[in-house]
């Protein structure tokens, strides 16, 4: 702890950019490295989950990411469930962002588009298209709307439910209505639930005790796109937050006699090096935003915005352009080949090589790699 004033202390924490991996074992061939992981009954070949935003995930994007071994999470409260012509609406939004550099213009339009009511038929149709393609189907809902939307999603045939907000606790208390008790909610479902975000050890442990199959660390913090620090004074030191959640996972594993809850890191991961460091800190998988937004398959056409940017009264994000001109395919973003020397393409290839250089063959073992603070 560091004293920041008389009688007030704060904890020293670390960002991913402040740490480095330290190889200390025999190196291996990257061809011998496995990046596979399993969430409940569902196996994925790469530890990559798409952040649930309309800037990324359409049914087509989710299908392609699933085909490549990852998981695309549809935003159940986004534009896809509100507008039949979602492509035209997104194009309108991008046009506004390109014409007017002031972020408020595009955010205002985004709020207007989200003011349209959710259409269960549109949402169910989008889910069905993903399911029919044979890939794992996951949809995100907020804690506030989880009880209302989940029956619609279950009827459409989802495999995984993601209950996600900027900050999620085991119980969401509301004086004006019935609180959401995640433990009760999850126990009544037949599908696995991933919940988050959390920023600390205690909240992560509490979420694990609800029966969640996975816990999301962070809220998708993205330079130039998310503004939770400016609006709420809340930010996430991802290296520390991931390590704390991993410690909660170990504690819960001992507490239950072997139940393993997966940790998903969501925020401040832009390159393959940061992806590798997130895994090294204890994450089982990462949730990516801007790295995937540059792909040709992303719905946002090279633009990214978080779901919180559409909040009707307190937006906590803006539109950010991530790619100009010809955009790489999702295959190239994830698996290469890359002509970019800064780690923004061939993300999984970079992770494999980092693991191989450090002498590890699988993700769980790689969580034990040595780390140093480099500040």
Swiss-Prot record:
Enzyme Commission no: 1.-.-.-
For this UniProt record, give its keywords in alphabetical order, as a comma-separated list. NAD, Oxidoreductase
Q: Which domain of life is it from?
A: Bacteria
One Gene Ontology term of the biological-process aspect is: GTP biosynthetic process
Is NAD found in the keyword set?
A: yes
- Any one GO MF annotation of this record: IMP dehydrogenase activity
What's the source species for this entry? Mycobacterium leprae (strain TN)
Q: Which family does it belong to?
A: Belongs to the IMPDH/GMPR family.
InterPro entries for the chain? Aldolase_TIM, IMP_DH, IMP_DH-rel2, IMP_DH_GMPRt
Q: Which Pfam families match?
A: IMPDH (PF00478)
What is the protein's name according to its record? Uncharacterized oxidoreductase ML0388
């Amino acid at each position: 702890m560091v004293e920041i004033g008389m009688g007030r202390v704060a904890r020293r924490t670390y960002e991913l950019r402040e740490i480095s991996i330290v190889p200390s074992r025999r190196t291996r061939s990257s061809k011998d490295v496995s990046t596979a992981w399993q969430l409940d009954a569902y196996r994925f070949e790469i530890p990559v989950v798409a952040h649930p935003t309309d800037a990324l995930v359409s049914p087509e994007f989710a299908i392609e990411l699933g085909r490549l071994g990852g998981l695309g999470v549809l935003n159940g409260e986004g534009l896809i469930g509100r507008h039949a012509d979602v492509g035209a609406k997104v194009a309108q939004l991008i046009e506004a962002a390109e014409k007017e550099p002031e972020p408020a213009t595009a955010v205002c339009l985004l709020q207007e588009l989200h003011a349209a009511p959710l259409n269960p038929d549109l949402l169910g149709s989008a889910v069905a298209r993903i399911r029919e393609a044979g890939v794992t189907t996951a949809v995100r809902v907020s804690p506030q709307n989880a009880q209302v939307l989940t029956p619609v999603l279950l009827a459409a045939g989802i495999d995984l439910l993601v209950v996600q907000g900027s900050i999620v606790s085991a119980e969401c208390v509301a004086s004006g209505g019935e609180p959401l008790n995640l433990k009760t909610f999850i126990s009544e479902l037949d599908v696995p639930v991933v919940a988050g975000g959390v920023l600390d050890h205690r909240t992560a442990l509490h979420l694990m005790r609800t029966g969640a199959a996975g816990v999301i660390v962070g809220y998708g913090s993205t330079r130039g796109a998310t503004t939770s620090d400016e609006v709420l004074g809340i930010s996430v030191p991802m290296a520390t937050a991931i390590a704390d959640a991993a410690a909660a996972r170990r504690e819960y594993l001992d507490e239950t006699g072997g139940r393993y809850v997966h940790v998903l890191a969501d925020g401040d991961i832009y390159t393959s090096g940061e992806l590798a460091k997130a895994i090294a800190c204890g994450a089982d998988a990462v949730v990516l935003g801007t790295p995937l937004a540059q792909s040709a398959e992303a719905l946002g056409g090279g633009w990214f915005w978080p779901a919180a940017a559409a909040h009707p009264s307190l937006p906590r994000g803006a539109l950010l352009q991530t790619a100009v001109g010809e955009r790489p395919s999702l295959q190239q973003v994830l698996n290469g080949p890359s002509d970019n020397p800064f780690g923004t393409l061939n993300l999984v290839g970079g992770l494999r090589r980092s693991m191989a250089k450090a002498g590890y063959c699988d993700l769980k073992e790689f969580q034990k790699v040595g780390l140093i603070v480099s500040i």
